[in-house]
Amino acid sequence: MNKDKIRVALADDQPLVREGFRYVINAQTDMTVSGEAGDGHDIIALAKQTKPDVILMDVQMPRCSGIEAAKDIMSALPNTKIVILTTFDTEEYVFEGIRAGAVGYLLKDTLPEELIDAIRAAARGEAIFRTVTAAKIISETFRAKQQTHAEELAEPFTKRELEVLQQMAYGLRNEDIAEKLFVSESTVKTHVHRILQKCNAQDRTQAVVFAIRNGIVQ
């Protein structure tokens, strides 16, 4: 197996769902399915044994939920990227997924090309929250008063930094953010750098999760 490929583990209690994901992922030249599990306990054991780059995690599974499994895996393997993939587009699952350390939240009816893009983005350390509910939560979070998390910041976000941070939460890259906000890519890079400094984050995902969490915990 090519070590340069993104190693993806699948966690879903429905064999047909795993088969579909496996087919789509293994058809790519830059990624491969490194293992599969049908319940929460098995994906925890599999992850600790094989250390995949990305895990596609169903929420509702036997013996241990995807959320609980994600918490366990993230405590042992903080560099593993977990994407919650489910049929349930609810605020509860979005919140719980974020708290568990997931970097993404997608629906199972996501188009194959969007799924592949999300896996690549997760492997790069980017956050992907593209469901209607996740987008709504993120938008509400960034409309909230900055006092919500001001005490934890070295200095408050500027209006433009909040706009950039919101686009980061949608999974957009610097060039896409620049086009959307009508600024140069170098300007976006400067904003991203300042955002990471202000929330003491090592990467984009940490910055996004910090912002969302501080909008949730009022």
UniProtKB/Swiss-Prot annotation:
It comes from the Bacteria. The modification 4-aspartylphosphate is found at D58. The keyword Hydrolase does not apply. Phosphorylated by YxjM. Keywords: Cytoplasm, DNA-binding, Phosphoprotein, Transcription, Transcription regulation, Two-component regulatory system. One of its GO terms (molecular function) is DNA binding. InterPro entries: CheY-like_superfamily (IPR011006), Sig_transdc_resp-reg_C-effctor (IPR016032), Sig_transdc_resp-reg_receiver (IPR001789), Tscrpt_reg_LuxR_C (IPR000792), WalR-like (IPR039420). Residues 174-193 bind DNA. The keyword S-adenosyl-L-methionine does not apply. GO terms for cellular component: cytoplasm. It is found in: Cytoplasm. Pfam families: GerE (PF00196), Response_reg (PF00072). This is Uncharacterized transcriptional regulatory protein YxjL. Residues 7-123 form the Response regulatory domain. Probable member of the two-component regulatory system YxjM/YxjL. Residues 150-215 form the HTH luxR-type domain. GO terms for biological process: phosphorelay signal transduction system; regulation of DNA-templated transcription.
